[in-house]
């Protein structure tokens, strides 16, 4: 197993090879609470489950993908109470408050609007909601789930998945703020503020270069949420969305990617919105690969200074096809956020008992200097 330890002022190449910088832990008072020791907070993060209905049998499920996803759920249910290896700090895995899903829950939401595609999408979404549930009481998963949509859920059409998330948000445990569109939402756990921002962060205004994915005014929601839910800039904030952002951190201008996955102008506006807020970390999926980076709003090639930058974590696919799968176990304790990766590598038949192990660990301060 590989353990990634805190570093002191690493250069970029060293950072990308060995993990994120950690700082000394201090107890951070949460918004609306008096200063004091916070109760530990645990949660899981998964991504890219790609529940699949085959094209030749749209009312059924791909048995291989279904098996892997159900193994994933059973693993999530069984991890709490197990012992962490000493290289990961030892102790027991705590019971999570919930599971964050970084998008691409299903597979056929990008396949168009033919009757066949619609049938596949409906079969997949019905299976996802049946297995993953919502509050921890309805499905196979025993914990509440907090999902955002990815490009395989919907590209730009308000389909059954988008409408399903909107309906689920009204019943999702602990949610305190929902966007005007009904799609984006936020909540608080143990003094930490979480914001679910959909596929990308943007506003899709006509006067800006438009990425191909509809943002449903997620940028406006982010601004409003930070202004009204974190007004004193003391509460640690965790953001999550589907698409990775470092590739699209480029100068905003007429030549920005008009047909790319994410408008460079929207990415610029995203960073401008959050750079003076205490964002602890950003999580994304999409790439089906582990990514650990820092983001300071500058193009990737210029990213050499780590101070005042935001840690960004990209998750491996948790389901789907391929040979490598992973999930994050996150623990907030003593003023720090520790992210541990549990992964099943080089196994096409993923998550079989005994094939996964603890692979990586990062510790970052809960409150970043803004």
What are these regions (language model features)?
Residues 1-10:
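N-terminal secretory signal peptides
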Residues 11-27:
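N-terminal export leaders
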Residues 12, 35-67, 144-146, 175-265, ...:
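Metal-dependent phosphoester/phosphodiester hydrolase catalytic core
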Residues 32-118:
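N-terminal active-site segment of His-dependent metallophosphoesterases
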Residues 46-47, 99-103, 146-150, 239-241, ...:
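Active-site neighborhood of phospho(di)ester-bond hydrolases with catalytic His/Asp-centered motifs
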Residues 83-91, 137-143, 235-237:
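Surface-exposed patches in mature extracellular/periplasmic domains of secreted proteins
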Residues 108-227, 269, 273-275, 289-339, ...:
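Extended active-site neighborhood of metal-dependent phosphoesterases/phosphodiesterases
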Residues 343-370:
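Acidic, His/Gly-rich catalytic cores of divalent-metal-dependent hydrolytic chemistry
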């Amino acid at each position: 197993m590989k353990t990634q330890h805190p570093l002191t002022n690493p250069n970029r190449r060293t950072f990308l090879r060995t993990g994120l910088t950690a700082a000394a832990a201090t107890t951070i008072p949460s918004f609306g609470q008096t200063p004091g020791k916070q109760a530990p907070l645990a949660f899981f993060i998964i991504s890219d489950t790609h529940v699949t209905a085959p094209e030749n049998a749209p009312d059924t499920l791909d048995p291989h993908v279904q098996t892997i996803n159900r193994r994933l759920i059973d693993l999530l249910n069984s991890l709490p109470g197990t012992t962490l290896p000493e290289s990961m700090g030892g102790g027991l895995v705590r019971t999570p408050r919930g599971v964050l899903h970084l998008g691409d829950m299903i597979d056929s939401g990008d396949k168009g609007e033919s009757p066949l595609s619609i049938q596949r999408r409906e079969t997949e979404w019905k299976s996802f909601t049946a297995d993953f549930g919502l509050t921890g009481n309805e499905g196979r998963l025993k914990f509440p789930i907090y999902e955002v949509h990815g490009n395989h859920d919907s590209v730009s059409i308000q389909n059954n998945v988008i409408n399903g998330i909107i309906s689920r948000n009204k019943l999702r445990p602990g949610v305190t703020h929902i966007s005007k569109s009904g799609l984006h939402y936020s909540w608080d756990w143990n003094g930490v503020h979480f914001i679910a921002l959909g596929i990308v962060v943007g506003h899709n205004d006509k006067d800006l270069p438009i990425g191909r994915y509809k943002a449903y005014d997620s940028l406006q929601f982010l601004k409003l949420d930070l202004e009204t839910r974190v007004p004193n800039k003391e509460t640690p904030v965790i953001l999550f969305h589907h698409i990775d952002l470092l590739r699209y951190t480029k100068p905003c201008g007429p030549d920005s990617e008009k047909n790319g996955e994410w408008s460079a102008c929207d990415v610029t506006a995203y960073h401008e919105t959050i750079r003076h807020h205490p964002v602890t970390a950003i999580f994304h999926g999409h790439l089906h690969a582990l990514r650990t980076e820092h983001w300071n709003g500058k193009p990737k090639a210029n990213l050499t200074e780590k101070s005042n930058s935001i840690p960004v974590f990209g998750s491996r696919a948790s389901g789907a096809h391929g040979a490598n799968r992973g999930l994050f176990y996150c623990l907030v304790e003593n003023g720090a956020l520790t992210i541990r990766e549990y992964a099943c590598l080089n196994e096409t038949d993923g998550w079989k008992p005994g094939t996964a192990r603890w692979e990586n660990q990062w510790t970052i301060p809960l409150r970043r200097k803004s």
